[in-house]
UniProtKB/Swiss-Prot annotation:
GO molecular function, a single term: pimelyl-[acyl-carrier protein] methyl ester esterase activity
EC number: 3.1.1.85
Localization per record: Cytoplasm
Protein name as it appears in the record: Pimeloyl-[acyl-carrier protein] methyl ester esterase
InterPro entries named among the record's database cross-references: AB_hydrolase_1 (IPR000073), AB_hydrolase_fold (IPR029058), BioH (IPR010076), Carboxylesterase_BioH (IPR050228)
Primary location group: cytoplasm
NCBIfam families: bioH, PRK10349.1
GO cellular component assignments: cytoplasm
Pathway: Cofactor biosynthesis; biotin biosynthesis
Domain AB hydrolase-1: 15-242
Subunit structure, interactors included: Monomer.
Gene3D superfamilies according to UniProt: alpha/beta hydrolase
Pfam families from the UniProt entry: Abhydrolase_1
Length: 256
């Protein structure tokens, strides 16, 4: 039986589901889960194939979203970080009646660089896929180091991410590859133009994976959404700026 690992804490009248990024697991939220569970009923999830949600293999974005929805509350704010942002966005597109608000963190509707679009160069993603089969622990560590580069607390933030990864069994190589395939191929720029719920996009100014140039482009493409840039954060603003991060979510709660 393939089970999604799911933990619920807090007693808030609004549910908040947190979806982590590639290679990680729900332990990444431990820096903010106490604070958030005093305002929300908080749901911590290991995405299929990651952390404690074992036995899935590589999934498409649509299948990943459906697997996560099985155990989800009827209505919630869905927050997704990085790859998790694509999963949360997919749920908002296919089941809008279950999403009170959509929050994406250091995420892009199209992670891969295109002619007219800043992002991760496709050969970099392909390189990660190649290196995974050679030395996958080192490849994951390199990817984590990329996420915190440039911040004042880069070293300790990278340590926090590494600790999260090492706390639980590593995902299977095919699961990690499948996640990179989603980052390489998915493009939700047009579909997300029409999501009906409040939509908040959070970014780090120093992010090396989601260039800040996408922010004004998406402001224009999705005029109903709101964006916020953490001036001194990279790819994990909730680790480097936990207080500011939680304030934004509590403020959003008033709008749903």
């Amino acid at each position: 039986m393939n089970n999604i690992w799911w933990q619920t804490k807090g007693q808030g009248n609004v549910h908040l589901v947190l979806l982590h990024g590639w290679g990680l697991n729900a332990e990444v939220w431990r820096c903010i889960d106490e604070e958030l569970s005093s305002h929300f009923t908080l749901h911590l999830v290991d995405l299929p194939g990651f952390g404690r949600s074992q036995g899935f293999g590589a999934l498409s974005l649509a299948d990943m979203a459906e697997a996560v929805l099985q155990q989800a509350p009827d209505k919630a704010i869905w927050l997704g970080w990085s790859l998790g942002g694509l999963v949360a966005s997919q749920i908002a597109l296919t089941h809008p009646e279950r999403v009170q608000a959509l929050v994406t963190v250091a995420s892009s509707p199209c992670f891969s660089a295109r002619d007219d679009w800043p992002g991760i160069k496709p050969d970099v993603l392909a390189g990660f896929q190649q290196q995974l089969s050679d030395d996958f622990q080192r490849t994951v560590e390199r990817f984590l180091a990329l996420q915190t580069m440039g911040t004042e607390t880069a070293r300790q933030d990278a340590r926090a991410l590494k600790k999260t990864v090492l706390a639980l069994p590593m995902p299977e190589v095919d699961v990690l590859n499948g996640g990179l395939e989603i980052l390489k191929t998915v493009d939700l720029r047009q579909p997300l133009q029409n999501v009906p719920m409040p939509f908040l996009r959070l970014y780090g100014y120093l992010d090396g994976l989601v260039p800040r140039k996408v922010v004004p482009m998406l402001d224009k493409l999705w005029p109903r959404s709101k964006s916020y840039i953490f001036a001194k954060a990279a790819h994990a603003p909730f680790i480097s700026h936990p207080v500011e991060f939680c304030h934004l979510l509590v403020a959003l709660k008033q709008r749903v």
